[in-house]
Amino acid sequence: MLDVLRWTTARFEKHGLASPRLDAELLAAHAFAMSRIELYAHFDRPLSASELASYRDLVSRRLAGEPVAYLLGHKEFWSLDLLVDSRVLIPRPDSETLLEEALDRVAGSGAGLRIADVGTGSGALALALAKERPEAQVFATDISPDALAMARANAERLGLAVSFLEGDLNQPLGPAGRFDLIVANLPYIPSADIDGLAADVRSEPRLALDGGADGLALMRRLVAAAPELLQPAGCLALEVGADQAGAVEELLRGAGLGDIRCRRDLAGIERVVSGVKGTSS
C-alpha cells in the first residue's frame, strides 16, 4: 500500500500537480474503499488485481487532467457532501467566503426571509443557505438543465428544500417576487485567460468559467437587474476574481446600491463584494 502511494506521489510530482500526496491518498481511499487513515493503518494489506486496475485507471485520468472531485464523484462544501461531475463547477473554499458574507448580511432577519442563488451549478450555495436558514424560502437558478439535475439530486440527497428554476441569470426569478438576499458565484474569468488555466480547471464546464472579455459580463447584467429583484434593504452579494473587487464595487454603486462591503478570502484576496438596496454608500 505504501509503495503504491509513494509511486503515485512521485508520478504526480513529476507531472506538476499541486497536491500530489493528497491526490494519491484520496484516489487510493476511493479505489480501495477505505478512509485515508485506514490506508496507513492497513499499509501492509495485499491489493487485489481489480483494486489495482481501478486505482491505475484513476491515476491515469488524474494525469490526463481530470479533477479529483470528478474522479471521486463528490466534494465537501460547508460540511455538505455534494455530488459533482463534469456537468458542474466544483465548489471551492473561496465560495465559503461568499456564504459567510451572505449569512452576516441576513443575520438579523426573521421569518419570511427570501433568498435567491443565481447560477447555482451544483447547488452548493443554495443548499448551504437552506441548511443555515431553514425558515427561509430559497430559490436557485441555472441556465444549464444538466447542472440543475445535479443540484436537484444534491437537494434530495441532503433533504434540503430549494426551489430550482431553469433560465438565464435572474430571468426565471420574475414570477417569484422580490428577495431579501441574492447571492451569485457567476463566471468571472476573462475569455482570453481560459486556455491558460490548469488542465483540471479547463475540464470544468466552460459555461461556468467564462465571464466574457473582462470577466464581468454576467455580473453587469445581474447588478443592473438587482434594484428590481431586491426588497427594500435587500442585499446582493457576489463572488469576484482577484483584482475585480474595485470594478464590481463601482457597478453596485452605479445601480444605486449602498453599504458596499468587500470581504477577503483566506488568501487575503478581496473575494466578495456586497451591497444593499436603498442605503447610501
Each model region followed by its residue ranges:
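Conserved SAM/SAH cofactor-binding pocket of Class I
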Residues: 97-200
